[in-house]
Every structure is written in C-alpha cells, then in structure tokens.
C-alpha cells in the first residue's frame, strides 16, 4: 500500500512542460537545422523521448516540423496528448496517410 501512495504523490507532482519552453526548444532546433542543412523543408520526429522533449507528451504519432510551423499528429490517445501537453498544434489522425495528405 505504501508503494501506491508514493506513486500517487510522485504523479501529482508532475507538471506539464510550459508552452514557452516547448516553443524555445523548437526554435533552437530550427536554428540548428538552418545552420546544418540550409534549405531544409521538413523534419519528422517519431522517437518517444524526442517527442516528449518537443511536445511534452509521448503519445503515438509523429511530430512534423517545418521552418514555418510544427504539427503533432497523434494516432492514439489524442485526448491524453491534449491534456498532458501545452504544444500549440495537436491534431488527431487515424493513419499516417492523413498527415501525409495534409502536406500534399
């Protein structure tokens, strides 16, 4: 029983990553991409730890980053992603084809 109580305490202490921090991380990534790969058009992030770093949640999906925007396409647990994250653009998708179709 004590383990469950400790788990609840730790869970209650977790706070979402602030939106300003998420935006700063994206801007740093874009600056690095501009320096290393001038003219880059899009980067796809699907590794869960990297997704957490950029979005504040690790739901199944893909984060697509372009110089002008970034969209986190969530395949499973969209509601959880929205509840956990302060990322500015989270969209649901049923398959990765939906995200691909958005970009033409």
Summary of predicted features, one role per range:
Residues 1-72:
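Terminal domain-start leader segments
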Residues 74-102:
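Compact, glycine/acidic-enriched structural inserts
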